């Protein structure tokens, strides 16, 4: 319990929005693989679909190249995503949403682009689904601290 509270505080303290790249990030003490597994459980508990898990570092190994542990998890909810695409069909290029997990030193960084930033690029920031999706993204990141 104490570790969960400390981890939660650390994730909240380290979560930041990078203005240049529009990424929201947090750090975890878990390995990339452990963080991805925990994230997948959090996604499943919210009835969100994991569409794909792309293990870039394993693909690099297969190509005879080396890179730090890096995985992208592609997630979404057709019930919510469809509402956003009904509002602005071109935003379909950005869906489903992606979460990035990569090793940085002895930490795992979890990063995503807030749907609010994505929607703004398409002039869809007023769509009702944007706030709901943005909240879901933030809650998934918070779930990583539990």
Residue ranges: model-predicted function:
Residues 35, 39, 56, 133-137:
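Stable alpha-helical elements in mature extracytoplasmic
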Residues 8-16:
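Bacterial N-terminal signal peptides
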Residues 48-95, 100:
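Compact, glycine-rich, soluble single-domain proteins
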Residues 98-123:
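Beta-strand/loop substructures that line and gate deep hydrophobic ligand-binding cavities in soluble
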Residues 22, 71, 108:
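Small-molecule pocket liners
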Residues 1-4:
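Positively charged n-region of N-terminal signal peptides that target proteins for export
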């Amino acid at each position: 319990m104490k570790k969960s509270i400390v981890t939660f505080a650390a994730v909240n303290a380290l979560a930041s929005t990078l203005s240049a790249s529009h990424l929201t990030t947090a750090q975890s003490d878990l390995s990339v693989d452990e963080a991805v597994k925990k994230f997948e459980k959090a996604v499943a508990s919210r009835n969100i679909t994991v569409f794909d898990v792309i293990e870039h570092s394993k693909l690099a190994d297969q190509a005879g190249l080396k890179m730090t542990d890096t995985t992208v998890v592609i997630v979404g909810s057709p019930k919510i995503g469809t509402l956003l695409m009904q509002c602005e069909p071109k935003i379909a290029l950005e869906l489903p949403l992606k979460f990035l997990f990569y090793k940085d030193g002895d930490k795992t960084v979890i990063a995503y682009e807030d749907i609010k930033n994505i929607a703004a690029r398409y002039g869809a920031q007023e769509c009702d689904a944007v706030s709901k999706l943005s909240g879901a993204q933030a809650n998934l990141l918070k779930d990583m601290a539990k």
